[in-house]
Amino acid sequence: MLKTITDLKPSRFLFAALLMGALTACAIPPSDDKEAMAEFEKANDPFEPANRLVFAANVAVDQLVLQPTAVTYRDLFPNELKPPIENFITNLFMPLSFLHSLLQGDMERANMAATRFFTALPTFLLGNTMPDKQPVFEDAGQTLAVWGFEQGPYVMLPLIGPSSLRDTFGTIGDFFFDPVGWVTDTPVTIGRATGNAIVRRSNNIDQVRDLQRNSLDYYAAVRSLYRQQREDQVRNGGSVPVQPAP
């Protein structure tokens, strides 16, 4: 079933409310201390007070819900059933990755995403749970980056986690234009996001624990790690030239 505008409006209002809440809780620049001011500008986190509150709430949800679910999946779920489930979830991201690869002018990755999507289903039905083609993950935030848009201020989104102003608008864009979202019911999109979150969390349980244990400031460590990972994703692990927006 296609989404209608009335289905989407509540999400617009929710995002507007969250953004306004962040804007009313901006950090105050330390204007009298040059070193502190340099650190403040480097962090590019003017919404830090609000971001830290959201971060604390996200950590609580993770510890109460997501982490226990991910541990159960990792330790108790039958290993032979994990590959087909994880590959099915991954393949549901390929149409969006195909779209953004085209928008970025990357025909090679567009072909990889399309090939992965269209060959995975028949091979899955024939019993091959490990497709030969590697997945490609692209999103609107990466497309905006390739078009030359800067990251902008750091933003911590409820439940979604670390983001930037650019990637926040990208998340909204993907919600509207995700091909899977347009041709399926909302529960399918929610199920994909939930399943992906559980699988990803099950793969980094020990790493997250180490980061929490060894970080003087867990929030700042997550912020730094997120930015490094996003830069790597934008470059696809290498150097990506900036393309003009169409």
Predicted regions and their residues:
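Mid-length scaffold segments of soluble, non-membrane domains
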Residues: 88-165
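A structured, mid-to-C-terminal "fold-capping" secondary-structure block
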Residues: 34-41, 144-246
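Membrane interface segments of multi-pass transport proteins and intramembrane proteases
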Residues: 64, 70-81
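Post-signal peptide N-terminal segment of mature Sec-exported envelope proteins
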Residues: 34-64
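Bacterial signal peptide processing site
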Residues: 27-30
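Bacterial N-terminal signal peptides that target proteins for export
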Residues: 2-15
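Terminal hydrophobic membrane-targeting helix
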Residues: 43-44, 78-85, 102-103, 107
